[in-house]
Amino acid sequence: MAETTQAVQAKPKRGMSKSLRDSLVAYSSIAPNFIGFCIFTLVPMIFAIGLSFCNWDGVHPVEFTGVSNFVALLSDKTFKAAFVNTLVYAIGTVPLTLVCSLGLAMLLNQKVKFRNFFRTVSFFPYVASLVAVAAVWNMIFSPSMGPVNQILATLGVENLPKWAAGKDTAMLTVILFSVWKNMGYYMVIYLAGLQGTNPELEEAAELDGASKWQIFWNVTLPQLKPTTFFVIIMLTIASFKVYDQMYMITQGGPGNATMTLVYYIYNVAFVNTPKYGYASAVSMVLFVLVLFVTIIQFKGSSSND
């Protein structure tokens, strides 16, 4: 009896499903950013949280000290000055930059001659090198040879301000510099927001006899609420972590008049004897401060919707 052999045919391999393929493409696209976030943000943040409960100078072994770093902050006069200065800088910078950038955007959104030229000029300080613009700013506001004080002297002002060199005027100088440098960037954001407003609502309000101020306050500004919220969040975070302006103009002085939290963290961690644990404790205070203010802003925005 002849044996019959049965050919075994291999089942064809099924190709990768479309959903799986799309998922792999998506994950491969976000993987570089996610890995970079973990390496350069998440891991250092976790390390800083742990280090805030320790003493470490970068050479000797890490010594766990509990909450002693945070207790020491309560009696640290320089930390208190930096904390207050950071709040003062934020309170001065955020509303001024907001108003100036919005006003500039409203002005340059009109059909005026050389509009594109003025937009470019307004944006230039933001993209220019901070070192260059800070040097020009220090020259303009020089107490002895600056053109600003020379104009004030011509007008008969006797006690000329020392600007960045004066303890009472140094913070004001840095605030004015920051507003001037950054308002061009937020002007562009507001210009983009103005392009999304409904002109028909403004025309209807104008036909109803509303003044320009009433149209702006009751029609245009409410439509810019998402843009304004974004600008406030960005300005607040930037003002709390300010460092470069202080370093280039005042170096945190005179005295501690312009010492901010980030500048203090830098001094504690990298100047003289490094105290990485103490600097990490200060950074945790800054993190909580930014988080607290941001949550309040989100709550306020949600309640007004």
Predicted segments — roles?
Residues 1-20:
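Short, Lys/Arg-rich, polar N-terminal cytosolic tail immediately upstream
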Residues 22-305:
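A structural signal for multi-pass alpha-helical bundles of membrane permease subunits
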